[in-house]
Amino acid sequence: MRFDVVTLFPEMFSALTQWGITGRACEQFLASVHLWNPRDFCSDPRKTVDDRAYGGGPGMVMMVKPLEDTVAGIRASHEAAGIKSGPICLLAPQGERFSQKIATDILSYGNLSFICGRYEAVDQRFVDRNVDLQLSIGDFVLSGGEIPAMAMMDAVIRLIPGALGDGQSATQDSFMNGLLDYPHYTRPEIYENLSVPDVLLGGHHAKIVDWRRQKSLELTFRLRLDLIESARAKGLLTREDEQFLRSL
């Protein structure tokens, strides 16, 4: 999986490329992150990438040409590597809310380019001419698109076969089956008078599977009822699931 990231702060991405699961995935060439600074595509001595907004108002607006020239550089790099360019994604508060399903969709693209906005906004003409999709991580505003881009890349990289130590880890994450994850426990067996549930200590696999499913249903019902409704609409709930939910 290849990511191309347009950012004024490429140094930020060392947190993703050098550490943890995502860092190992990059080391093993399961994923690659290519960083592109629009200032490198500016011809003026000051490397100007922003200007005042027409019509007035606070803040500066990222200019069209440096961004378009950067995108042209990305596409030229793809052509030289013999790969087809994937979608261009702008990180923006008005974008579609990122989800596990979108992470799975992105993985299927093979490559994706992120545009990390800064300042007040990105010139709309760049958006109209170049952007295929806009994504957000929530109804709040950050200083730029770098943190959302890293969060999304982390979610996608986890899905790459071989990226996780345990092949089942990703499939058992929250949201993969439409529900929240079940509780997890490790040693010691008793801590401050709090014990690990007996069913997890008995070694009966079928009972453990049932307990985990019920706990997943219970947590989702209490914390994210909207996910229960969505799972029901998609046919992800069994008759036994529905019977258990009625008992809550």
UniProtKB/Swiss-Prot annotation:
Q: Which UniProt keywords apply?
A: Cytoplasm, Methyltransferase, S-adenosyl-L-methionine, Transferase, tRNA processing
Instruction: State whether keyword S-adenosyl-L-methionine applies.
Output: yes
State the Gene Ontology BP annotations: tRNA N1-guanine methylation
Q: Name one GO cellular component term.
A: cytosol
InterPro entries, alphabetized: Alpha/beta_knot_MTases, tRNA_m1G_MeTrfase_C_sf, tRNA_m1G_MeTrfase_TrmD, tRNA_m1G_MTases_N, tRNA_MeTrfase_TRMD/TRM10
The GO terms this record gives for MF are: tRNA (guanine(37)-N1)-methyltransferase activity
Q: Which SUPFAM superfamilies does UniProt cross-reference here?
A: alpha/beta knot
The kind of enzyme this is, by top-level EC class, is transferase
What catalytic activity does the UniProt entry give for this protein? guanosine(37) in tRNA + S-adenosyl-L-methionine = N(1)-methylguanosine(37) in tRNA + S-adenosyl-L-homocysteine + H(+)
Q: Which domain of life is it from?
A: Bacteria
In the Enzyme Commission scheme, what number(s) does this protein have? Answer: 2.1.1.228
Q: Where in the cell is it found?
A: Cytoplasm
Give binding positions for S-adenosyl-L-methionine. Answer: 117, 137-142
Q: How does this protein assemble? A: Homodimer.
What's this protein's function?
Answer: Specifically methylates guanosine-37 in various tRNAs.
The record's family statement is: Belongs to the RNA methyltransferase TrmD family.
User: What's the name of the protein?
Assistant: tRNA (guanine-N(1)-)-methyltransferase
Per the UniProt record, the source organism is Polynucleobacter necessarius subsp. necessarius (strain STIR1)
Query: What high-level taxonomic lineage is stated for the organism?
Result: Bacteria, Pseudomonadati, Pseudomonadota, Betaproteobacteria, Burkholderiales
